[in-house]
Amino acid sequence: MNSDMMTAATAGTEVFRCALARRRNANPPHLVLAPTFAAAAAGGAANSSGEEAPRGERKHLFNPFGCMLGRSYFRRCREEMNEGYFAKVPTGYFPVAPSEVPCRVPVEGVVAGEVLSYSALPLPKIEKRFYKQLNDGTFVRLPFLYPEVYYEGEEEPADERYYIRADAADASSADPSTLPEEAFAKVPPAIAEGITNWQGPKRIPIPSERYVMKLGFEYQLHVTEDAFQEVNTSFMRLDLQSSPDPHPRGARQPRSRAHVSAENPEDTPVAV
């Protein structure tokens, strides 16, 4: 192979490598990183001070705290020692209903050459999951074994466990997240000592497999898991945004944004 052929092969490899890198860093057009609640506080402070918002940026915001309404949520413990008890969901997580898309299986006895037909399975009865939005705009799901495990950067779960009061209304509800806080009572200390993990909860890193909200669902207050798309953030460049003062006193604060970098700016939804 002469020098010209070697140069051409090297150039072709470099072009392919750059195209692959852009493809990994690109944000699919049907996905959107919903703006965080902290970013809206900064935007509101800037608008109140007379600063105009840059053109092309989203003004609507997905506010997970609108789903919480200031109440506490409880989640069933899934660790064997705590089975049958409940733990309080940490602050910042909001309930998300299970998927409403039924599973489909091919109908048996299909003749070759015919159009495939499917049979829909009934939706399983799944309790609500809890999601939290990070400062970079992505979402994470509450760990499956919470409160035995929790993410880094969050407060360590308390040792308190709860049970559903027998005299509570809808005590036999299949989904404890729909019950009010008054329906739960703390487990007595004498029993709690026997079911508490003596080694303490385990801290785990935030996974790279996270979720982003599909375009259009950021306008809804109550969402299902159909509104989220799982992504691997290992191939994404995420811009962190600081949490501004929740009670600004007329001070002008810089507008913070969360977005995914992409080569084409039109394919990159910017969140304010």
Swiss-Prot record:
Instruction: Quote any Pfam family the record assigns.
Output: Herpes_IR6
What ranges does the record give for the region Disordered, renumbered to this chain?
238-272
Query: The organism sits in which domain of life?
Result: Viruses
Stretches of Basic residues bias are at: 249-258
Do you know which InterPro entries this protein is assigned to? Herpes_IR6 (IPR010447)
Full protein name: Uncharacterized gene 67 protein
- Gene name of the encoded protein: IR6
